[in-house]
Amino acid sequence: MSLFNQQPIALQQRHADTAFPLVLMPSHQMANFDEVAQQREALMAQLAIHGAIVFRGCGITDDQRFDCFVTAFGLENFPYAESLSNAVRRNRTPRVFTANEAPRDVEIFLHHEMAQTPLFPRYLFFCCEQAAAVGGATPLCRSDVLLQRLEARLPRFIDRCREKGACYSLVMPGVADQASGQGRSWRDTLGVESREAAEARLASLDYQWRWLPEECLAVTTPALPLIRQTSA
Protein backbone atom coordinates (compact mmCIF):
# COMPACT_ATOMS: atom_id res chain seq x y z
CA MET A 1 0.00 0.00 0.00
CA SER A 2 2.41 2.63 -1.32
CA LEU A 3 0.16 5.57 -0.47
CA PHE A 4 0.47 4.87 3.27
CA ASN A 5 3.16 3.77 5.69
CA GLN A 6 2.36 1.90 8.90
CA GLN A 7 3.21 3.56 12.21
CA PRO A 8 3.26 1.99 15.69
CA ILE A 9 1.63 3.87 18.57
CA ALA A 10 1.57 3.52 22.35
CA LEU A 11 -0.95 1.02 23.75
CA GLN A 12 -1.47 -0.56 20.34
CA GLN A 13 -2.79 -4.09 20.80
CA ARG A 14 -2.13 -7.27 18.84
CA HIS A 15 -4.77 -9.91 18.21
CA ALA A 16 -4.05 -12.98 16.07
CA ASP A 17 -0.80 -11.27 15.08
CA THR A 18 -2.59 -8.20 13.70
CA ALA A 19 -2.28 -4.67 15.05
CA PHE A 20 -5.30 -2.98 16.61
CA PRO A 21 -5.76 -0.34 15.51
CA LEU A 22 -3.74 -0.21 12.30
CA VAL A 23 -2.12 3.24 12.06
CA LEU A 24 -1.42 4.66 8.60
CA MET A 25 0.37 7.85 7.54
CA PRO A 26 0.60 9.12 3.94
CA SER A 27 3.95 8.55 2.27
CA HIS A 28 3.60 11.98 0.63
CA GLN A 29 1.41 15.06 0.90
CA MET A 30 -2.06 14.64 -0.59
CA ALA A 31 -3.54 17.59 -2.46
CA ASN A 32 -6.86 15.74 -2.68
CA PHE A 33 -8.16 12.30 -1.87
CA ASP A 34 -8.22 10.80 -5.35
CA GLU A 35 -5.47 8.38 -4.35
CA VAL A 36 -7.50 7.27 -1.37
CA ALA A 37 -10.40 6.49 -3.69
CA GLN A 38 -8.06 4.49 -5.93
CA GLN A 39 -6.94 2.38 -2.96
CA ARG A 40 -10.39 2.00 -1.42
CA GLU A 41 -10.56 -1.78 -1.86
CA ALA A 42 -7.13 -2.31 -0.30
CA LEU A 43 -8.00 -0.04 2.63
CA MET A 44 -11.32 -1.77 3.24
CA ALA A 45 -9.56 -5.14 3.16
CA GLN A 46 -7.13 -3.88 5.81
CA LEU A 47 -10.05 -2.63 7.88
CA ALA A 48 -11.63 -6.10 7.79
CA ILE A 49 -8.38 -7.63 9.05
CA HIS A 50 -7.50 -5.11 11.76
CA GLY A 51 -10.93 -3.94 12.91
CA ALA A 52 -10.01 -0.23 12.96
CA ILE A 53 -7.67 2.13 11.11
CA VAL A 54 -6.25 5.38 12.44
CA PHE A 55 -5.26 7.77 9.63
CA ARG A 56 -2.75 10.45 10.57
CA GLY A 57 -1.29 13.36 8.64
CA CYS A 58 -3.90 13.32 5.88
CA GLY A 59 -4.44 17.07 5.85
CA ILE A 60 -7.95 16.91 7.30
CA THR A 61 -8.30 20.38 8.82
CA ASP A 62 -12.07 20.92 8.89
CA ASP A 63 -15.43 19.27 8.32
CA GLN A 64 -15.35 19.90 4.55
CA ARG A 65 -12.03 18.10 4.13
CA PHE A 66 -13.27 15.30 6.35
CA ASP A 67 -16.38 14.99 4.18
CA CYS A 68 -14.18 14.69 1.09
CA PHE A 69 -12.04 12.04 2.78
CA VAL A 70 -15.08 9.96 3.75
CA THR A 71 -16.62 10.38 0.29
CA ALA A 72 -13.44 8.95 -1.26
CA PHE A 73 -14.36 5.54 0.17
CA GLY A 74 -17.48 5.38 -1.98
CA LEU A 75 -19.74 4.20 0.84
CA GLU A 76 -23.45 4.89 1.03
CA ASN A 77 -24.25 7.79 3.33
CA PHE A 78 -26.14 7.14 6.57
CA PRO A 79 -27.94 10.45 7.30
CA TYR A 80 -28.25 11.12 11.01
CA ALA A 81 -31.72 12.61 10.52
CA GLU A 82 -32.94 9.17 9.38
CA SER A 83 -31.45 7.35 12.37
CA LEU A 84 -33.22 6.42 15.60
CA SER A 85 -30.28 7.43 17.79
CA ASN A 86 -31.23 9.43 20.87
CA ALA A 87 -28.01 11.47 21.04
CA VAL A 88 -28.20 15.20 20.34
CA ARG A 89 -25.95 15.89 17.34
CA ARG A 90 -25.53 18.65 14.76
CA ASN A 91 -24.93 18.08 11.07
CA ARG A 92 -21.89 19.96 9.78
CA THR A 93 -22.11 18.53 6.24
CA PRO A 94 -24.40 15.87 4.71
CA ARG A 95 -21.93 13.19 5.88
CA VAL A 96 -20.39 14.80 8.96
CA PHE A 97 -22.10 15.44 12.28
CA THR A 98 -20.90 16.09 15.79
CA ALA A 99 -20.32 13.08 18.03
CA ASN A 100 -22.48 14.43 20.86
CA GLU A 101 -23.64 17.82 22.10
CA ALA A 102 -23.63 16.81 25.78
CA PRO A 103 -21.44 18.77 28.23
CA ARG A 104 -17.81 17.71 28.51
CA ASP A 105 -18.31 16.14 31.93
CA VAL A 106 -20.83 13.60 30.59
CA GLU A 107 -18.97 10.31 30.20
CA ILE A 108 -19.94 8.14 27.23
CA PHE A 109 -18.93 4.52 27.63
CA LEU A 110 -17.97 1.91 25.06
CA HIS A 111 -20.91 0.97 22.85
CA HIS A 112 -21.85 -0.19 19.39
CA GLU A 113 -23.17 2.74 17.41
CA MET A 114 -26.99 2.69 17.41
CA ALA A 115 -27.06 -0.99 18.41
CA GLN A 116 -30.13 -0.26 20.54
CA THR A 117 -32.15 0.49 17.39
CA PRO A 118 -33.04 -1.52 14.27
CA LEU A 119 -31.23 1.06 12.09
CA PHE A 120 -27.46 1.42 12.34
CA PRO A 121 -24.45 2.28 10.15
CA ARG A 122 -22.11 -0.37 8.80
CA TYR A 123 -18.97 1.76 9.05
CA LEU A 124 -17.97 4.70 11.25
CA PHE A 125 -15.46 7.48 10.61
CA PHE A 126 -14.27 9.75 13.42
CA CYS A 127 -12.30 12.97 13.08
CA CYS A 128 -10.66 15.06 15.80
CA GLU A 129 -11.01 18.68 14.70
CA GLN A 130 -9.32 20.08 17.81
CA ALA A 131 -7.38 17.85 20.18
CA ALA A 132 -8.20 18.19 23.88
CA ALA A 133 -5.48 19.71 26.05
CA VAL A 134 -6.17 17.03 28.67
CA GLY A 135 -7.87 13.66 28.16
CA GLY A 136 -10.23 13.50 25.22
CA ALA A 137 -9.33 9.96 24.15
CA THR A 138 -11.77 7.84 22.16
CA PRO A 139 -11.48 4.22 23.38
CA LEU A 140 -11.84 1.34 20.93
CA CYS A 141 -12.60 -2.32 21.54
CA ARG A 142 -12.48 -5.26 19.13
CA SER A 143 -15.90 -6.79 19.62
CA ASP A 144 -14.93 -10.09 18.03
CA VAL A 145 -12.09 -10.54 20.52
CA LEU A 146 -14.35 -9.54 23.41
CA LEU A 147 -16.96 -12.07 22.25
CA GLN A 148 -14.36 -14.85 22.08
CA ARG A 149 -13.30 -14.15 25.66
CA LEU A 150 -16.87 -14.01 26.89
CA GLU A 151 -17.66 -17.29 25.13
CA ALA A 152 -14.74 -18.90 26.95
CA ARG A 153 -15.65 -17.50 30.38
CA LEU A 154 -19.46 -17.29 30.21
CA PRO A 155 -20.65 -19.70 27.50
CA ARG A 156 -24.17 -20.11 28.90
CA PHE A 157 -24.65 -16.36 29.13
CA ILE A 158 -23.58 -15.93 25.50
CA ASP A 159 -25.95 -18.73 24.45
CA ARG A 160 -28.79 -16.88 26.15
CA CYS A 161 -27.77 -13.64 24.45
CA ARG A 162 -27.92 -15.34 21.06
CA GLU A 163 -31.23 -16.97 21.90
CA LYS A 164 -33.13 -14.08 23.42
CA GLY A 165 -31.66 -10.79 22.20
CA ALA A 166 -32.62 -7.71 24.20
CA CYS A 167 -35.31 -5.05 24.43
CA TYR A 168 -34.12 -1.49 25.02
CA SER A 169 -36.14 1.14 26.86
CA LEU A 170 -35.60 4.87 26.91
CA VAL A 171 -37.42 8.11 27.58
CA MET A 172 -37.34 10.87 24.96
CA PRO A 173 -38.13 14.48 25.88
CA GLY A 174 -40.50 16.64 23.89
CA VAL A 175 -37.71 19.19 23.39
CA ALA A 176 -34.04 18.29 23.01
CA ASP A 177 -32.16 18.15 26.32
CA GLN A 178 -28.73 19.58 25.53
CA ALA A 179 -27.38 18.60 28.96
CA SER A 180 -27.89 14.88 28.35
CA GLY A 181 -25.85 12.47 26.26
CA GLN A 182 -29.17 10.91 25.24
CA GLY A 183 -31.42 13.94 25.04
CA ARG A 184 -32.65 13.96 21.44
CA SER A 185 -36.35 14.79 21.32
CA TRP A 186 -38.91 12.27 20.10
CA ARG A 187 -39.82 14.68 17.31
CA ASP A 188 -36.26 14.67 15.95
CA THR A 189 -35.66 10.99 16.67
CA LEU A 190 -38.79 9.82 14.87
CA GLY A 191 -38.85 12.58 12.26
CA VAL A 192 -42.39 13.66 13.14
CA GLU A 193 -44.23 16.69 14.52
CA SER A 194 -47.32 15.25 16.22
CA ARG A 195 -48.16 12.56 18.74
CA GLU A 196 -50.28 10.76 16.18
CA ALA A 197 -47.41 10.62 13.70
CA ALA A 198 -45.06 9.46 16.45
CA GLU A 199 -47.38 6.60 17.37
CA ALA A 200 -47.73 5.58 13.72
CA ARG A 201 -43.94 5.52 13.29
CA LEU A 202 -43.46 3.52 16.48
CA ALA A 203 -46.12 1.02 15.43
CA SER A 204 -44.35 0.52 12.09
CA LEU A 205 -41.16 -0.28 14.03
CA ASP A 206 -42.98 -2.69 16.38
CA TYR A 207 -42.06 -0.51 19.38
CA GLN A 208 -44.14 -0.25 22.55
CA TRP A 209 -44.74 3.21 23.99
CA ARG A 210 -46.48 5.31 26.61
CA TRP A 211 -46.78 9.05 27.05
CA LEU A 212 -45.40 10.68 30.19
CA PRO A 213 -45.88 14.14 31.74
CA GLU A 214 -44.20 17.16 30.15
CA GLU A 215 -44.54 15.66 26.65
CA CYS A 216 -41.99 12.93 27.32
CA LEU A 217 -42.31 9.62 25.51
CA ALA A 218 -41.19 6.25 26.92
CA VAL A 219 -40.49 3.57 24.33
CA THR A 220 -39.32 -0.04 24.29
CA THR A 221 -37.89 -1.73 21.22
CA PRO A 222 -38.82 -5.21 20.06
CA ALA A 223 -36.24 -7.91 20.86
CA LEU A 224 -33.08 -7.01 18.93
CA PRO A 225 -30.06 -9.27 18.35
CA LEU A 226 -27.34 -8.93 20.96
CA ILE A 227 -24.76 -10.60 18.72
CA ARG A 228 -24.38 -9.99 15.00
CA GLN A 229 -21.82 -11.17 12.50
CA THR A 230 -21.36 -8.69 9.68
CA SER A 231 -19.55 -9.13 6.42
CA ALA A 232 -16.35 -7.16 5.80
Descriptions of predicted regions:
Residues 1-232:
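Non-heme Fe(II) oxygenase catalytic core, chiefly the N-lobe of the double-stranded beta-helix
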